[in-house]
Swiss-Prot record:
It is found in: Cytoplasm. Disulfide bonds: none annotated. Residues 442-604 form the Helicase C-terminal domain. Residues 587-603 have a biased composition (Basic and acidic residues). Keywords: ATP-binding, Cytoplasm, DNA damage, DNA excision, DNA repair, Excision nuclease, Nucleotide-binding, SOS response. GO terms for molecular function: ATP binding; ATP hydrolysis activity; DNA binding; excinuclease ABC activity. GO terms for biological process: nucleotide-excision repair; SOS response. This is UvrABC system protein B. The UvrABC repair system catalyzes the recognition and processing of DNA lesions. A damage recognition complex composed of 2 UvrA and 2 UvrB subunits scans DNA for abnormalities. Upon binding of the UvrA(2)B(2) complex to a putative damaged site, the DNA wraps around one UvrB monomer. DNA wrap is dependent on ATP binding by UvrB and probably causes local melting of the DNA helix, facilitating insertion of UvrB beta-hairpin between the DNA strands. Then UvrB probes one DNA strand for the presence of a lesion. One of its GO terms (cellular component) is excinuclease repair complex.
Length: 683
């Protein structure tokens, strides 16, 4: 195992066994699930499914399984928001191990495209988040230097990445006492794609001060100071970026490239020769087709890229030449994050019923966009090799897989050696009781149920359309119900405030369309009402119904009412499954003498800018002067960075938007520094 050196101050640097630090022991069905899953993998099972009901502690169960298996693990989530939540949970559960985060580093991403119908070329446009880029480099570095690694990732994990062999081969090892001149070090850093910048010291740069060279690696929060005595490295120091204070002295360190697509000089020369040869063939192809515009276009664009590669070792869109930068052939699977893992790693696919379809859909969407670029002379055909993995390639690269879901899909069930159920919750809560009522007078019945709900309990109502939700909210208000409406345009600040208001009793009812996407796990909710439950479709599928019913499973008094004029197949299956689980839970509690208890979850101050409970004063009244606006923006920027550091990307983006509004209102204020994640969608 290679030394990691002093570059990871935010997590331990030494290999340790994966060890869970939890304030509680496994309970409910967790002990049996852990034992069964571990035994399955140890006996040779390649694929298993953990079917865990809402609130059963699936993440904790997975953590205890990892502790038993002691293997590097990839945890896949279907969006950045869920990945961030899992990342925080695993970091808390494994404080002494390398828990890493790997998602798309784009705040904004417009892929390169060409629209033939209108002869419109759309150049690639993007904004990269530096903190997420740092975390991506931290993830790949950890995978190549230690074993106790858990990487939480989105579907970015199946998109092209640089050759891990190049990334590892080019790593620069420095030791105190090495015979190496300052000039040799500077040359080596340039080859690793680090840039010299003596003024603006940021990630991926180095600066020189006399006999001292300071390097700010892509993957750490501290810099490395290299002090020379003549042509010998005298000392290696870890230093604070802000004040320059020495944190520690280190005997050695390992500097990995600043770009995942970095390549050794000899490989780059070969790549350029291959690109030049392919370019000649492509020009001939277009000329034979009589398409002189495309011939000129591909020649100009590719020649410029070649010149940049020759001068700097890098070019914009270098990923489109990735097949030339590695030892693979055209058509072979691209190198991805999965190739940085050692053999025999474990893959955990969270919310597999959503993540599996997402993985399956990535390749075709990417291919169709690139066809137009290649056929019209904007890219060489090898651009096709810069792509996500096909699903069968993903399967081939993952050895042992654990699917995790409350509602596994057919794929998981068909491909798993066993499906392990986790039905009994650690809190011993049972699934809610279910009633089906006619849809004809659903609103009148709903109002009666709301009025019968105790003051300390809450109600969630889900409708099919935005218009229905708005009309219902207005009707309930006129009937004297304290109600609010949550929809897809409700931003993070409003969502936090709405949920808090519901929990505090400021409102009793929350109406929404797809309550699943809101992540509403509220212990006070004792009634979930599903209107028009017999309208087949995504929002009323078996999976969605089971998930929505689970929103009432955190309260002892939890119940669900489905309004329908007929019982659809989806309804029947969802009701049967929920009642089956409820019976198992009740039998377990009776046999072991357990009393269900409502989950206790304190209602904390949201302290979010723009909220009524903003105790930091960020949510000031609208400023009247430029000075007031500048003061408010300064506070908002501090909160924005805190949110980004905590991986609360949607919140950070909403604060960023508030800053932009203030700057537009008060002319003359400088533009905000970009670098805060936008709400998630991968590509």
């Amino acid at each position: 195992m290679t030394d990691t050196g002093p570059l990871q101050p935010d997590r331990p640097d030494l290999d340790r066994p994966l060890s869970v630090d939890a304030p509680f022991e496994p309970a409910g069905d967790q002990p049996d699930a852990i034992e069964t899953l571990v035994a399955g993998f140890e006996s040779g099972a390649e694929k298993q499914t953990l079917l865990g009901v809402t609130g059963s502690g699936k993440t904790n169960t997975v953590s205890w399984v990892l502790e038993e298996l002691q293997q590097p693990t990839l945890v896949l989530a279907h969006n950045k928001t869920l990945a961030a939540q899992l990342y925080e949970e695993f970091r808390e559960l494994f404080p002494d191990n390398a828990v890493e985060y790997f998602v798309s580093y784009y705040d904004y991403y417009q892929p390169e495209a060409y629209v033939e119908q209108t002869d419109t070329y759309i150049d690639k446009d993007m904004s990269i988040n530096e903190e997420i880029e740092r975390l991506r480099h931290s993830a790949t570095r950890s995978l190549l230097t230690r074993d106790d690694v858990i990487v939480v990732a989105s579907v970015s994990a199946i998109y092209g990445l640089g050759d891990p062999a190049n990334y590892e081969e080019m790593a620069l090892r420095l030791e105190a006492g090495d015979e190496r001149s300052r000039e040799d070090l500077l040359s080596a850093l340039v080859e690793l794609n680090y840039e010299r910048n003596d003024v603006d010291f940021q990630q991926g740069t180095f600066r020189v001060r006399g006999d001292t060279v300071e390097i700010y690696p892509m993957y750490g929060r501290h810099a490395v100071r290299v002090e020379f005595w003549g042509d010998e490295i005298d000392r290696l120091l870890k230093v604070d970026i802000v004040d320059g204070e020495v944190v520690s002295e280190e005997p050695a360190t390992l500097i990995h490239p600043a770009e995942h697509y970095s390549v050794p000089d000899r490989r780059l020369e070969t790549a350029i020769e291959e690109i030049e040869g392919l370019l000649e063939d492509r020009i001939d192809y277009f000329e034979r087709q009589g398409d002189l515009v495309a011939a000129q276009r591909i020649e100009e664009r590719t020649t410029f890229d070649i010149e940049m590669l020759q001068e700097t070792g890098h070019c914009s869109g270098i990923e489109n030449y990735s097949v030339h930068m590695s030892d693979r052939e055209t058509g072979e699977p691209p190198y991805t994050l999965l190739d940085y893992f050692p053999d025999g790693f474990l893959t955990v696919i969270d919310e597999s019923h959503q993540t599996i379809p997402q993985i399956k859909g990535q390749f075709e969407g990417d291919r169709s966009r690139k066809e137009s670029l290649v056929e019209n002379g904007f890219r060489l055909p090898t651009a096709y090799d810069n792509r996500p993995l096909k699903f069968e390639e993903f399967e081939a690269k993952t050895d042992r897989t654990l699917y995790v879901s409350a509602t596994p899909g057919d794929y998981e069930r068909d491909h798993s050696e066993q499906v392990v159920e986790q039905i009994v919750r650690p809190t011993y809560l049972v699934d809610p009781d279910i009633e089906v009522e006619p849809a004809e007078k659903q609103v009148e019945d709903l109002i009666e149920r709301i009025q019968a709900t105790p003051e300390d309990e809450r109600v969630l109502v889900t409708t099919l359309t935005k218009r229905m939700a708005e009309d219902l909210t207005e009707y309930l208000e006129n009937a004297g119900v304290d109600v609010a409406y949550m929809h897809d345009e409700t931003d993070t600040l409003e969502r936090h405030e709405l949920v808090r208001s519901l929990r505090l009793g400021e409102i009793q009812v929350l109406v929404g369309i797809n309550l699943l996407r809101e992540g509403l796990d509220i212990p006070e909710v004792s009634l979930v009402a599903i209107l028009d439950a017999d309208q087949e479709g995504f929002l009323r599928s078996e999976t969605t119904l089971v998930q929505t019913m689970g929103r009432a499973a955190r309260n002892v008094e939890g119940s669900v009412v489905l309004y329908a004029d007929e019982t659809t197949d989806s309804m029947a299956a969802a009701i049967e499954e929920t009642r089956r689980r409820r019976e198992i839970q009740r039998e377990f509690n009776a046999e072991h003498g357990h009393e269900p208890r409502t989950i206790e979850k304190p209602v904390s101050e949201t302290n979010l800018p723009g909220s009524s409970t903003d105790t930091d004063g960020v949510a000031d009244v609208a400023p009247d002067t430029v000075d007031e606006a500048e003061q408010l923006i300064e506070r908002l920027e501090t909160r924005m960075q805190e949110a980004a550091d905590n991986l609360e990307f949607e919140l950070a983006a909403d604060i960023r938007d508030r800053i932009r509004e203030l700057r537009e209102t008060f002319d003359g204020l400088e533009d905000p520094n970009e670098g805060v994640p936008s709400p998630d969608e991968e590509f």
